[in-house]
Amino acid sequence: MGHRCNMHCTHCHVSAGPREKKQMERETVEDVIAVLRRNEIKSIDITGGAPELNPHFRYLVETAKALGTRVVVRTNLTVFFEDAMDGLPEFYAGNSVEIVASLPCYTEAGVDAVRGRGAFQKSIQALGTLNGLGYGDGSGEKRLSFVFNPAGAFLPPPQCRLEDDYKRELQRRFGISFDSLYVFTNMPIGRFRDILIKNHSLEKYQSELERSFNGRTLGGLMCKDMISVGWDGKLYDCDFNQILGLGLDENYPRHISELDVMRLIGREIRVDEHCYACTAGQGST
């Protein structure tokens, strides 16, 4: 829904931050809703930046839910404490929104190193509130999941093992529970790419991704069963292509207002060297 965010994380492939101005306008939101009305789209995944900072965010969530669409929101948790965010956890619970929260570590030092001082304590406080509203209780009614990205230019550890570590440590230290954890490899784009260049490690990291290619990941790639809608309504195969400006091929719809789902069947997906991040090791889904 835009690049504006209350945080300025070092690994952010969107290069989001408090000063970013790119925001989805109401007209584009209405185009998204029109597509949901016309098609049997089962779910919508809302992201940013911090999508909650878009003034049309709650309208999109409520309208999508009213249409029977599964709504997933990617949140950084700390946005709960920003101005005008009062009642946000209750809004999520009242609409049975699935939450996928970014939490790069289960320790304060690990989180604050990536997201800034105080981010961890705010995240834990937000998670406690969500647990109190029934999120992450294992019933599946209010799902709470985490996203993990490595803190540097290396591949993440196995997802199952890391999920066990997160569940054990967050429960032991803070009484926090959640449903699942998703592991993503850092994309060599956006702000993370800038850091790689600054540290003279871009070529080394790209080579590591290519050496770690795993053909078994291809069946589960996100670009094969989703479409990414940019803040301006332009269409992409995935969120990462969106950041790079790699829109759908000219033979397919290029803007959400033109979207015909049937025309996307069997489409050719645009790829480039950054795609190795999704196919490296255990893969990213």
Sequence positions of predicted segments:
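Conserved phosphate-coordination/catalytic loops
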Residues: 23-27, 121, 269
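Flexible mid-to-C-terminal extensions adjoining Fe-S/redox cofactors in radical SAM and related proteins
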Residues: 234-285
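Residue-level signal for mature regions of secreted extracellular proteins and peptides
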Residues: 2-5, 216, 268-271
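Conserved alpha-helical substructure of the radical SAM core
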Residues: 2-48, 52-69
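A C-terminal junction/extension of Radical SAM enzymes
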Residues: 138-238
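A generic local structural motif
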Residues: 30-32, 84-88, 262-264
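Conserved AdoMet/S-adenosylmethionine-binding subsite of the radical SAM
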Residues: 54-184
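Short cysteine clusters
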Residues: 5, 9-12, 223, 238, ...
